[in-house]
């Protein structure tokens, strides 16, 4: 089997929405199986005014990131679909739908979205280095979305793999001064290994068991603070993608953002994404090696405050 692994039951030609689920990994592996309080003139704290979307939040304002900036921030999407033959990687069909849906979802949250297709390792590093060197003083946060093949700790450019940390560390507090104390969000759709999640039966599942497939630079803070990494899967495992419908993780993320992105805190959003991916998706294939597999996303947060868009 070449390219990504496949997994959706059908016969003959498949429609765009009924194509096989695939994984973002090497073919040879898969074959082996809040706003801050403001000071009044008298020195008393003035609570920030609440919009209709957040007036029912019971949160201490100083524990929320300040989003009261001219811009929400920049969102960079790197969408790698086609790879050089030397990488041994197949075409990531379905990723264009992911990129398009992500662009719409993040624009609706107020981000300035920029999408870059089929970038080499050097291109990705240059692109994000330039972004880190920009002046983000008028922005509340920064987001980056990587859509590609991957392995644990690695993301693939069109010409091969590179360490994810070589991209993310460009935005550390000691390198990107204008994002100090502001949330830096990374969403990564890629495999992190070659294991399959077989899933397990539970007696406490949902009733319907049908499965488808601020910154405040006056304080000294750690350089690694205020990062959030949302991975499509846990370390060591495959990440599934359908060539017609897009990836399980990205489509679930977009769905939750579209419905709750302006009401819920970021960890609430991502917890719901975890639930949707874990309960609503299961791979199906005529090949039993790739059938009835599951997936659970993984969130790694170094955020120091609550984040509401």
UniProtKB/Swiss-Prot annotation:
<keyword id="KW-0865">Zymogen</keyword>
<dbReference type="GO" id="GO:0005615">
    <property type="term" value="C:extracellular space"/>
</dbReference>
<feature type="propeptide">
    <location>
        <begin position="204"/>
        <end position="214"/>
    </location>
</feature>
<feature type="active site">
    <location>
        <position position="191"/>
    </location>
</feature>
<dbReference type="GO" id="GO:0005829">
    <property type="term" value="C:cytosol"/>
</dbReference>
<keyword id="KW-0963">Cytoplasm</keyword>
<feature type="region of interest" description="Disordered">
    <location>
        <begin position="1"/>
        <end position="53"/>
    </location>
</feature>
<dbReference type="Pfam" id="PF00656">
    <property type="entry name" value="Peptidase_C14"/>
</dbReference>
<dbReference type="GO" id="GO:0005737">
    <property type="term" value="C:cytoplasm"/>
</dbReference>
<dbReference type="GO" id="GO:1905686">
    <property type="term" value="P:positive regulation of plasma membrane repair"/>
</dbReference>
<keyword id="KW-0964">Secreted</keyword>
<dbReference type="GO" id="GO:0003723">
    <property type="term" value="F:RNA binding"/>
</dbReference>
<feature type="region of interest" description="Loop L3">
    <location>
        <begin position="234"/>
        <end position="246"/>
    </location>
</feature>
<dbReference type="InterPro" id="IPR002398">
    <property type="entry name" value="Pept_C14"/>
</dbReference>
<keyword id="KW-0021">Allosteric enzyme</keyword>
<dbReference type="GO" id="GO:0006915">
    <property type="term" value="P:apoptotic process"/>
</dbReference>
<dbReference type="InterPro" id="IPR011600">
    <property type="entry name" value="Pept_C14_caspase"/>
</dbReference>
<feature type="region of interest" description="Loop L1">
    <location>
        <begin position="81"/>
        <end position="92"/>
    </location>
</feature>
<feature type="active site">
    <location>
        <position position="149"/>
    </location>
</feature>
<dbReference type="GO" id="GO:0004190">
    <property type="term" value="F:aspartic-type endopeptidase activity"/>
</dbReference>
<comment type="function">
    <text>Thiol protease involved in different programmed cell death processes, such as apoptosis, pyroptosis or granzyme-mediated programmed cell death, by proteolytically cleaving target proteins. Has a marked preference for Asp-Glu-Val-Asp (DEVD) consensus sequences, with some plasticity for alternate non-canonical sequences. Its involvement in the different programmed cell death processes is probably determined by upstream proteases that activate CASP7.</text>
</comment>
<dbReference type="GO" id="GO:0070227">
    <property type="term" value="P:lymphocyte apoptotic process"/>
</dbReference>
<comment type="subunit">
    <text>Heterotetramer that consists of two anti-parallel arranged heterodimers, each one formed by a 20 kDa (p20) and a 11 kDa (p11) subunit.</text>
</comment>
<feature type="compositionally biased region" description="Basic and acidic residues">
    <location>
        <begin position="1"/>
        <end position="31"/>
    </location>
</feature>
<dbReference type="InterPro" id="IPR002138">
    <property type="entry name" value="Pept_C14_p10"/>
</dbReference>
<feature type="site" description="Involved in allosteric regulation">
    <location>
        <position position="192"/>
    </location>
</feature>
<dbReference type="InterPro" id="IPR029030">
    <property type="entry name" value="Caspase-like_dom_sf"/>
</dbReference>
<protein>
    <recommendedName>
        <fullName>Caspase-7</fullName>
        <ecNumber>3.4.22.60</ecNumber>
    </recommendedName>
</protein>
<feature type="propeptide" description="N-terminally processed">
    <location>
        <begin position="1"/>
        <end position="24"/>
    </location>
</feature>
<dbReference type="InterPro" id="IPR015917">
    <property type="entry name" value="Pept_C14A"/>
</dbReference>
<dbReference type="GO" id="GO:0097194">
    <property type="term" value="P:execution phase of apoptosis"/>
</dbReference>
<dbReference type="GO" id="GO:0004197">
    <property type="term" value="F:cysteine-type endopeptidase activity"/>
</dbReference>
<keyword id="KW-0378">Hydrolase</keyword>
<feature type="region of interest" description="Loop L2">
    <location>
        <begin position="192"/>
        <end position="201"/>
    </location>
</feature>
<keyword id="KW-0694">RNA-binding</keyword>
<dbReference type="GO" id="GO:0005634">
    <property type="term" value="C:nucleus"/>
</dbReference>
<keyword id="KW-0788">Thiol protease</keyword>
<feature type="site" description="Involved in allosteric regulation">
    <location>
        <position position="231"/>
    </location>
</feature>
<feature type="region of interest" description="Loop L4">
    <location>
        <begin position="282"/>
        <end position="296"/>
    </location>
</feature>
<dbReference type="InterPro" id="IPR033139">
    <property type="entry name" value="Caspase_cys_AS"/>
</dbReference>
<keyword id="KW-0645">Protease</keyword>
<keyword id="KW-0539">Nucleus</keyword>
């Amino acid at each position: 089997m070449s390219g990504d692994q496949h997994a959706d039951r059908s016969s003959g030609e498949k429609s765009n929405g009924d194509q096989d689920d695939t994984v973002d990994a090497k073919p040879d592996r898969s074959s082996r199986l809040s706003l801050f309080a403001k000071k009044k003139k008298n020195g008393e704290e003035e609570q920030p005014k609440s919009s209709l979307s957040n007036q029912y939040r019971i949160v201490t304002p100083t524990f929320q990131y300040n989003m009261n900036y001219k811009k929400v921030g920049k969102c960079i999407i790197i969408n790698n679909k086609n790879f050089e033959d030397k990488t041994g990687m197949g075409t990531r069909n379905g990723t264009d739908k992911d990129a398009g849906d992500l662009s719409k979802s993040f624009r609706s949250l107020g981000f300035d979205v920029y999408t870059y297709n089929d970038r080499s390792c050097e291109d990705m590093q240059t692109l994000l280095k330039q972004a880190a060197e920009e002046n983000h003083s008028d922005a509340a946060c920064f987001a980056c979305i990587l859509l590609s093949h991957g392995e644990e700790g690695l993301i693939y450019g069109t010409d091969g793999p590179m360490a994810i940390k070589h991209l993310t560390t460009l935005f550390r507090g000691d390198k990107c001064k204008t994002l100090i104390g502001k949330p830096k969000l990374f969403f990564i759709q890629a495999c992190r290994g070659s294991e399959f999640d077989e899933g397990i039966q539970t007696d406490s599942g949902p009733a319907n068991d049908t499965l488808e497939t601020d910154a405040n630079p006056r304080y000294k803070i750690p350089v690694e603070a205020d990062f959030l990494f949302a991975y499509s899967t846990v370390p060591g495992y495959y990440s599934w993608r359908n060539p017609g419908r897009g990836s399980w993780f990205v489509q679930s993320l977009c769905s939750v953002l579209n419905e709750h992105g302006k009401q819920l805190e970021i960890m609430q959003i991502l917890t719901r994404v975890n639930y949707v991916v874990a309960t609503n998706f299961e791979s199906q294939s005529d090949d039993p090696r790739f059938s009835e597999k599951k997936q659970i996303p993984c969130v790694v947060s170094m955020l120091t405050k609550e984040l509401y868009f």
